[in-house]
């Protein structure tokens, strides 16, 4: 490490700051706060003559000067753009008139107030559907083939994290009772998917209500479109993020206005505030109909910056510290600055980038400069034997990823397709792709209580089955350590189902993204676009007191504010401490749920170098675990920071006694062991360490579900208090807990609940679908005939299309019933017989391919030696083509006796394949016989049941419709008949059956 100053100068700079290290290249983040040398502004650094930087001296506000000024609202109770003192801000902004108490309202669904509100149709002036409605059907449907449009709608529903062919759990809770009719349900899903298409077609523009109604094809479906639009808008599936919603209403300044306070300016608080801004603009008419303006939003942040755990800092570099080969030196108008993230460097698109709302906001709405990565390149070194072959490492990685998939899939609730294709069979298929085979009849893996125990037992079991070597097990242990560092938690604390997207963290083709100007750039843009959110810094709330329908907030600066709604967006562990006091206190069940949350701490060490000495274009590298000493895993951040940079995550547990410079020395020492020939270049010019545990407001780096956490704790943590105090945190999100995405989702859901408490839940209309009168078909047909006479040939063609609607609807409903019966039959087969036997994979018939697979490492060593001898470079490595050429040359050099071992192995595999194929044929024949029996019995049982009433009614109407369409059949004469001649005896027999007594 570089010595940049003398000992005396060091003591002068760190006087009374209690910095954790005296190393000039070491920055202690979040140490003891000091008021000396505080520099106002955004991501600007403190200039110190001795070139020692202590981030505890920095102002924590990373927002640019323009954004920070715009963050303070104007024209609200006389607020000024100049930063006032805390007392002045409290007196000017927070002195709100106490709103009149309106009393408690009757509770509605799930204990929420049953307010009298209108649905979307009524708000927009369409209380019923008529021919004079100003909204045009099909106006939002693009001029593309219908098959293409339906495919786009299907993909858009998936991108909105909704099942395209079924109701989501929230939709089922709201609409399952009123959408019992399969026809209505199918129509609703098609409309809902179409609205999702309108949003994902261009998420920079919000989807208006009239545009959503234009997705329907008939006016009778307008109420369903209204419901779908309400659900998608309120739950944040559409119209989220940085969108500008035009308001055409004139607000009366004399109207009253409520206030919604948000405590905390992290990702949860900013996303909640931005979503509330969008919702209040969309539902402006609802508030005006109540005689009030849309509520104002105020965000209170205890620190001097926004972001919480999202922290980006600018590192200044001198000219001689920037290498000519780095991207900083080659960028036009580039400054000698390096933006580093103190926690998360990248976000994972879960499950894909198209379905990640944060990626949609950052890439399409904000157009931030993103860096994409898809495949993780792992480079491992053996300190004694050098670098390990990449394909060897990748093979063990795919085995490790398959184990994570099986652990995650077995613990979750399986849908229909997973019952037919269970995790065991998919795991076997993944191994078969790698080149290993195990039998499903003797499946060896068993789910254990923790992930650590599962991986340990699986490694022991698979060692004998797959003939894993000692090197394979060392690589496997390295991946276990990497997963533990990625999760920031010990694998002993990860139990089945605790991390829903566990297999995506190490996925082979999972896309991730970051931002060149730091992760805070996304949050700052979200807070300032399209209009700045009103954020007040240095406002630490210590008491939340509920009185009737209002909330009194008391701050540490002895000011008090009365608001109508409060959203608590601070870390969950702070609710169980004395940082914020609740009056009345929180319920015991909520406190117990908070105790079951698990918060961990890690130190992130960032090393900036002048030149890059490690392999380019890689993601992660490290060395195999040693018998003694701590093993570090290095993340290449060069593509993020545009300068040669490595980051290392170090667990705080067990190293509390170590100083920061000791940790850095250990990391640099391991780097020098891995890259011995380049040890002289391994000298960082800057070192940054994050110490989150020393921060008063975010004294942990990550959140993780403990093994004591219960599934119902999610609902307990998010449950509001008296429909007035709401909660949002990364711990509340069930799908993405402990992540930035989870904090964003919790803010969206909290905004939904706040809106429902202000204007009420979605009001279900009395009639979902305005249908034709089905009980008087003859009158309807008569009306159609009159219309046909009035309209002529064009009306005849149009009414003819309407006449076949009953027949088409009957066929569709009948086919849906048959599909449901087939689905039930498949489930029954899966439950009784299990999955279908898997055919054995055909072995290779070429002995050279087997030789190539087994002798790759030997020929690679020979090719490397040849390359080093020719080039004279002891570090030279042969390319893949050169290794393949060496393989072919050595194979051709072998005689028939030398090739015989591989030929014998191929013959043995063929014999084994023949035996397995015969066994498979026997099993599949027996399986097919049992399947045919089950299908026959199931079909007989279904045919014995009566046809559903709706289908029977449509069948009758279809038959009547067919009679009206072909009336000539009834009056067909004998001369015009094409039927064959019938014997008179048949005619007499039919007459005798009708008149048995009187006929003779």
Curated annotation (Swiss-Prot):
Its principal location? nucleus
Q: Which biological processes are named by the entry's GO terms?
A: facultative heterochromatin formation; heterochromatin boundary formation; mating-type locus imprinting; pericentric heterochromatin formation; regulation of replication fork arrest at rDNA repeats; replication fork arrest at mating type locus; silent mating-type cassette heterochromatin formation; subtelomeric heterochromatin formation
What are the boundaries of the region Demethylase activity? 279-950
Q: What segment(s) does the record annotate as region Disordered?
A: 104-123, 780-800, 959-1000
Residues holding FAD = 260-302, 328-329, 908-909
Tell me where on the tree of life, at the top rank, the source sits.
Eukaryota
Give me the stretches of Acidic residues compositional bias.
976-991
Q: What does this protein do?
A: Catalytic component of the SWM histone demethylase complex that specifically demethylates H3K9me2, a specific tag for epigenetic transcriptional activation, thereby acting as a corepressor. Acts by oxidizing the substrate by FAD to generate the corresponding imine that is subsequently hydrolyzed. Has a role in regulating heterochromatin propagation and euchromatic transcription. Also has a gene activating role.
Similarity annotation: Belongs to the flavin monoamine oxidase family.
Please state what the protein is called: Lysine-specific histone demethylase 1
């Amino acid at each position: 490490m570089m010595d940049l100053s003398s000992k005396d100068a060091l003591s002068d700079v760190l006087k009374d700051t209690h910095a954790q290290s005296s190393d000039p290249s070491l920055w202690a983040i979040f140490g003891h706060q000091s008021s000396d040398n505080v520099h106002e502004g955004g991501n600007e650094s403190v200039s110190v003559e001795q070139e020692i930087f202590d981030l505890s001296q920095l102002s924590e506000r990373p927002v640019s000067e323009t954004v920070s000024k715009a963050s303070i609202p104007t024209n609200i109770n006389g607020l000024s753009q100049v930063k006032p003192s805390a007392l002045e801000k409290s007196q000017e902004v927070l002195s709100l008139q106490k709103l009149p108490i309106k009393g408690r309202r009757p509770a509605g669904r799930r204990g929420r107030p049953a307010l009298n509100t209108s649905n979307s149709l009524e708000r927009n002036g369409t209380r019923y559907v008529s021919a004079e409605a100003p909204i045009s059907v099909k106006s939002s449907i693009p001029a593309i083939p219908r098959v293409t449009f339906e495919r786009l709608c299907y993909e858009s529903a998936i991108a909105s994290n909704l099942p395209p062919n079924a109701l989501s759990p929230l939709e089922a809770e709201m609409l399952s009772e009123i959408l019992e009719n399969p026809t209505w349900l199918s129509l609703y899903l098609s409309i809902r998917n179409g609205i999702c298409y309108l949003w994902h077609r261009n998420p920079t523009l919000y989807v208006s209500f009239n545009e959503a109604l234009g997705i329907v094809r008939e006016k009778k479906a307008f109420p369903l479109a209204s419901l779908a639009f309400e659900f998608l808008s309120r739950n944040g599936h559409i119209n989220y993020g940085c969108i500008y919603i035009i308001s055409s209403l004139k607000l009366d300044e004399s109207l009253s206005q409520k206030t919604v306070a948000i405590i905390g300016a992290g990702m949860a608080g900013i996303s909640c505030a931005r979503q509330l801004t969008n919702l209040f603009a969309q539902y402006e008419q609802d508030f005006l109909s109540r005689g009030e303006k849309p509520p104002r939003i105020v965000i209170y942040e205890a620190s001097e910056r926004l972001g919480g755990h999202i922290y980006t800092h600018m590192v200044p570099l001198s000219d001689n510290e920037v290498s000519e080969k780095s991207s900083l030196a080659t960028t036009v108008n580039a400054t000698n600055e390096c933006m580093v993230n103190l926690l998360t460097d990248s976000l994972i698109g879960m499950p894909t980038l198209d379905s990640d709302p944060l990626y949609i906001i950052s890439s399409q709405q904000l157009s931030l400069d993103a860096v994409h990565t898809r495949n993780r390149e792992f480079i491992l070194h053996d300190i004694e034997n050098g670098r390990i072959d990449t394909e060897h490492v990748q093979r063990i990685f795919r085995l490790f990823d398959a184990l994570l998939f099986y652990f995650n899939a077995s613990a979750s609730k399986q849908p229909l397709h997973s019952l037919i294709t269970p995790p065991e069979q998919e795991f076997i298929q993944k191994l078969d792709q790698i080149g290993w085979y195990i039998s499903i009849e003797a499946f060896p893996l068993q789910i254990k209580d923790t992930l650590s125990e599962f991986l340990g037992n699986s490694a022991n079991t698979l060692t004998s089955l797959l003939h894993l070597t000692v090197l394979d097990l060392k690589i496997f242990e390295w991946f276990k350590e990497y997963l533990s560092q990625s999760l920031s938690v010990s694998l002993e604390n990860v139990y089945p189902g605790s991390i829903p997207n566990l297999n995506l963290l190490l996925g082979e083709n999972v896309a991730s993204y970051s931002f060149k100007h730091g992760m805070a750039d996304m949050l700052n843009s979200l807070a300032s676009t399209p209009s700045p959110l009103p954020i007040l810094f240095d406002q630490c709330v210590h008491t939340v007191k509920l009185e009737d329908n209002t909330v009194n907030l008391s701050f540490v600066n002895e000011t008090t504010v009365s608001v109508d709604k409060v959203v608590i967006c601070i870390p969950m562990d702070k609710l169980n401490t004395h940082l914020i006091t609740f009056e009345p206190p929180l319920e015991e069940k909520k406190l117990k749920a908070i105790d079951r949350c698990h918060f961990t701490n890690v130190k992130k060490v960032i090393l900036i170098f002048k030149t890059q000495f490690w392999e380019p274009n890689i993601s992660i590298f490290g060395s195999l675990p040693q018998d003694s000493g701590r093993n570090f895993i290095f993340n290449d951040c060069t593509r993020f920071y545009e300068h040669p940079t490595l980051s290392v995550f170090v667990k705080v547990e067990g190293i509390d006694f170590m100083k920061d410079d000791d940790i850095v020395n250990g990391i640099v020492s391991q780097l020098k062991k891995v890259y011995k020939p380049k040890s002289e270049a391994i000298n960082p010019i800057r070192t940054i360490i994050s110490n989150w545990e020393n921060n008063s407001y975010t004294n942990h780096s990550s959140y993780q579900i403990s093994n004591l956490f219960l599934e119902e704790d999610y609902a307990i943590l998010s449950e509001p208090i008296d429909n007035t105090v709401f909660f949002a945190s990364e711990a509340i999100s069930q799908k993405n807990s402990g992540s930035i995405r989870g904090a964003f989702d919790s803010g969206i859901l909290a905004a939904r609940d706040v809106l429902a408490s202000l204007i009420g839940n979605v009001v279900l209309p009395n009639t979902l679908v305005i249908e034709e009168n089905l009980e008087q078909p003859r009158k309807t047909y008569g009306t159609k005939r009159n219309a046909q006479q009035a309209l002529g040939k064009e009306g005849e063609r149009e009414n003819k299309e309407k006449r076949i609607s009953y027949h088409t609807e009957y066929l569709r409903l009948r086919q849906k019933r048959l599909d449901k019966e087939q689905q039930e039959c498949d489930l029954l087969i899966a439950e009784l017989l299990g999955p279908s036997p898997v055919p054995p994979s055909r072995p290779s018939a070429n002995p050279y391919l087997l030789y190539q697979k087994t002798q790759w490492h030997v020929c690679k060593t020979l090719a490397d030696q040849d390359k080093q001898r020719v080039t004279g470079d002891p570090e030279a490595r042969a390319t893949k083509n050169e290794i393949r050429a060496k393989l072919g040359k050595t194979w051709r050099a072998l005689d028939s006796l030398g090739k015989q071992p591989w030929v014998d192995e191929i013959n043995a595999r063929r014999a084994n394949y023949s035996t397995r194929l015969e066994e498979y044929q026997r099993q599949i024949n027996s399986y097919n016989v049992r399947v045919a029996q089950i299908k026959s019995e199931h079909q007989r049982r279904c045919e014995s049941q009566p046809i559903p009433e709706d289908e029977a009614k449509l069948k009758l109407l279809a038959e009547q419709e067919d009679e009206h369409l072909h009336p000539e059949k009834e009056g067909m004469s004998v001369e015009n008949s094409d039927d064959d001649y019938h014997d008179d005896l048949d005619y007499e027999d039919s007459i005798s059956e009708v008149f048995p007594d009187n006929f003779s």
